[in-house]
Amino acid sequence: MSEMEVEKPDLTLYNTMTQLKEVYKPMNPGKIGIYVCGITAYDYSHIGHARAAVSFDLLYRYLRHLGYQVTYVRNFTDVDDKAKNCGEKPLDLSNRFCEEYLLDMAALQCLLPTHQPRVSDHMEQIIKMIEKIIENGCGYAVGGDVFFSVDKSPSYGQLSGQRLDHTQAGKRVAVDSRKRNPADFALRKAAKSGEPSWESPWGHGRPGWHIEFDIHGGGADLKFPHHENEIAQTCAACEDSGVNYWLHNGHVTNNNVKMGKSLNNFFTIRQIAANYHPLALRHFLMSAQYRSPLNYSVSQLESSSDALYSLSPYREEMSGDVGKTQQSAEAKEMIKKVKNALKFINVSISKLKKMQKKQRMSLVVSLVEVEKAVREVLDVLGLLTTLSYGELLKDMKQKALTRAGMGEEEVLQRIEERNMARKSKDFRRSDRIRELLAFKGIFLEDVPGDTVWRPSTPLTKPKSGLGLGMTAIVFAIVFTFLGFFFYSR
């Protein structure tokens, strides 16, 4: 058996259905299908939507990196009653915000899925599936609406842990007296004024739930009733849900309350990207174990931005120093561990954590191999920008100035004032200027013959040098990556 075969373990995923970490076994060897619930397109997407997109983009990237042929489907729900309140033709509104969402995903460096179906394009298939559900005795039509009978689904509630006798139908909306069971849900809704509708055997109407792979993913809030309903209706039509593994990412919270449009406590991707580079937002969204809640925090965004900025000059330094030194045994060991962590995800976390403590090792040598390893990690994590690093740094510095409420001329003026204070040995004033700028997230660094500035986390005392060391950054992002697959609740 080759060394590669010895090192490569089974891929392990946490399955929401069983609440266990399970060895992943594809339906078809070498091929994987992933279905992820996308947005309801009627407004700009917030960072809660972004977390789901980034989480499953990470999975998609990693599976492709392992060599799997991946079919990745992420849908658009472009048929919804929310659109009618926006003063625009519903499908025009949906089309516009589908395109805006794709621009947001490009900014976050989320790869395009292989398929992006829209509900409105698949009405014929949806109608056929509803007919099959009714034919199998699991659905019934009432006055143009079609409902699913949850009493016909013995396993209803298994995914979310909800017991049918404990579900609180009518908690948010009045119970429809036409239902045989208050928990029955709509497969199709009769047409209403101002909403798009399509002809069907039950009259004009639209789907109540989009009708759907080997892996099915989405936000934790979709477990019930959305994904429960998907399972029930698919089993009713096809005798099997067709899904073996259910993955759910945690909520993004604001002051520990789930971020959402109904509470108006959300920030859109566009709002954050106006002040931070989108890759800093991506880094932030991967900073917690993917199934855990992630609380929105300006300080955490600042830290992610700082880490992203710090990485760039180190990579430039590595590229510039290629071949100048011999590779140390310690550097070789670090490279090996990083590569193994990326390629074979079940590598021992405890061993990596022990290595993380060795951050004082000299800046890595034999830099061709190190840069290759780092680029490999960053590419899978979606943090390898297509911009030149000069362009990236320029963009991040401009956003730092925006957050600080300053122009670059003002910063340069403060640097000149500090230089004059140092020449006159007024070190108290010199330190005060540096401190005031640091308070605004502007860190001054003295280099031979000059003083330069860079973005930094405000209100924290900057460390010497360029902030996070390369080793620390590599291990930080590897731990983020491992967390997607490993950690349970």
Swiss-Prot record:
Transmembrane segments: none annotated. Keywords: Aminoacyl-tRNA synthetase, ATP-binding, Cytoplasm, Ligase, Metal-binding, Nucleotide-binding, Protein biosynthesis, Zinc. A motif ('HIGH' region) lies at residues 39-49. One of its GO terms (biological process) is cysteinyl-tRNA aminoacylation. Its cofactor is Zn(2+). ATP binds at K261. InterPro entries: Cys-tRNA-ligase, Cys-tRNA/MSH_ligase, Rossmann-like_a/b/a_fold, tRNA-synt_1_cat_dom, tRNAsynth_Ia_anticodon-bd. It catalyses: tRNA(Cys) + L-cysteine + ATP = L-cysteinyl-tRNA(Cys) + AMP + diphosphate. GO terms for cellular component: cytosol. Zn(2+) binds at C37, H226, E230. Coiled coil: none annotated. It is found in: Cytoplasm, Cytosol. Binds 1 zinc ion per subunit. Its EC number is 6.1.1.16. Signal peptide: none annotated. A motif ('KMSKS' region) lies at residues 258-262. One of its GO terms (molecular function) is ATP binding. Belongs to the class-I aminoacyl-tRNA synthetase family. This is Cysteine--tRNA ligase 1, cytoplasmic. It comes from Arabidopsis thaliana (Mouse-ear cress).
